[in-house]
Amino acid sequence: MTKKVYVKTFGCQMNEYDSDKMVDVLNAAEGLEKTDSPEDADIILFNTCSVREKAQEKVFSDLGRVRELKEAKPDLLIGVGGCVASQEGASIVSRAPYVDLVFGPQTLHRLPQMIDARRTSGRAQVDITFPEIEKFDHLPPARVEGPTAFVSIMEGCSKYCSYCVVPYTRGDEVSRPLDDVLTEVAGLADQGVREVTLLGQNVNAYRGALTAGSSEVADFATLIEYVADIPGIERIRYTTSHPKEFTQRLIDTYAKVPKLVNHLHLPVQHGSDRILMAMKRGYTVLEYKSVIRKLRAIRPDLSLSTDLIVGFPGETEEDFDKMMALVHDMRYDTSFSFIYSPRPGTPAANLHDDTPRDVKLKRLQLVQATIEENVARISQSMVGKVERILVEGPSRKDPNELAGRTENNRVVNFPAPLAAHPRLIGQMIDVKINHAYPHSLRGELVLVSDDASAATH
């Protein structure tokens, strides 16, 4: 009987990418297949996030729930990976002795060896070292499950923002060689991938050697241009970028590379220069707005999303008003906004925080309500227009329908004959939007490519 692995992912797209690689590694080494049911699994892995306290505590809550599975099935292996693993290390085993494996983001490729060592020695295995880019040299080719894919181009972060734990859990920035990234993207394109999302903690800080060991370096703009030249790739996204690394060369790329989507996630974190300085972000509000102004001069309809932290230590009403002014000015189309969560070991954790919790909550609600209004307004403005979408697969709401995404990252559901589904998935098609919902759009098929058109008849 085929053995199975269950992976639960917390946090960012980097973790989603890493989770897929965990499955690929275990499939290549031991023939394990992915399951969506922890009860059916022979190995259960939690790929964790430590950016916020709530996510970290959720891991231990979930570990407590799978403990019963381990008691019923003693051969079941339980592993904790990701940033909580890097931060907590062996203390995870002390707190939850039934955990067999603890591994960091940079050592997931060592899972087969760790599993062998656990079975041989009977002792929990912990490996949270930072072997830089080694993991990419040991990962098997990706197994594609649709027309979109993530591609990690770098690891770590060297910005050391005062509130952020990522540099301590993922290490400093290390870029993959250019040819290594292009080989992976080309392999994905050969398997039918049409859209790639380039991933990094600060993806636009990419500085990759042209080849392994080469002294010549390619910047992020160069990488995008090369990816755009790969046959089959029709759309390029990236996340997460940093305002400090948004060079003029990268801005110019929006004019030169049509395949670069009309959507950008650029975290600002706050709208007050005083708070940005305390956060050690390395830019001012004016500098951030200057980047957006230049981009919108090239792409007037550029859709912009961001990250916002409310209630950072010392935040005054005046600081918050400046954040709200920025939210209105930038016309954000989605944000990931949260109340500040102090992370142990970061400089900001030692700052005096005298803002009441209920004040922070009210501020967060105001930010989120304002951005939701923006989202609704932008979605409504798309009604009646024809949008180009990449068909990703059956709709989650109705498997008899199909779903895809617009350039500005809106999900569009639309009816299509069942017989046409296999041929339409992976196609770029035109859909007329006829209804806007809070978190998706609905439309009808207008125009498809010749191959897809034949499939609808």
From Swiss-Prot:
SMART domains named among the record's database cross-references: Elp3
Enzyme type, top EC level: transferase
One GO location term (cellular component): cytosol
EC numbers, comma separated: 2.8.4.3
Chief location category: cytoplasm
Matching Pfam families: Radical_SAM, TRAM, UPF0004
Keywords: 4Fe-4S, Cytoplasm, Iron, Iron-sulfur, Metal-binding, S-adenosyl-L-methionine, Transferase, tRNA processing
Transferase is among the record's keywords: yes
InterPro entries: Elp3/MiaA/NifB-like_rSAM, Methylthiotransferase, Methylthiotransferase_CS, Methylthiotransferase_N, Methylthiotransferase_N_sf, MiaB_methiolase, rSAM, rSAM_horseshoe
Residue positions binding [4Fe-4S] cluster 1: C12, C49, C83
CDD domains named in the record: Radical_SAM (cd01335)
Residue stretches making up the MTTase N-terminal domain: 3-120
Binding locations of [4Fe-4S] cluster 2: C157, C161, C164
Residue pairs linked by disulfide bridges in the UniProt entry: none
The Radical SAM core domain, residue ranges: 143-377
Keyword rRNA-binding belongs to the record: no
Reactions that this protein is recorded to catalyse: N(6)-dimethylallyladenosine(37) in tRNA + (sulfur carrier)-SH + AH2 + 2 S-adenosyl-L-methionine = 2-methylsulfanyl-N(6)-dimethylallyladenosine(37) in tRNA + (sulfur carrier)-H + 5'-deoxyadenosine + L-methionine + A + S-adenosyl-L-homocysteine + 2 H(+)
Family: Belongs to the methylthiotransferase family. MiaB subfamily.
Purpose: Catalyzes the methylthiolation of N6-(dimethylallyl)adenosine (i(6)A), leading to the formation of 2-methylthio-N6-(dimethylallyl)adenosine (ms(2)i(6)A) at position 37 in tRNAs that read codons beginning with uridine.
Protein name in UniProt: tRNA-2-methylthio-N(6)-dimethylallyladenosine synthase
Natural source organism: Burkholderia multivorans (strain ATCC 17616 / 249)
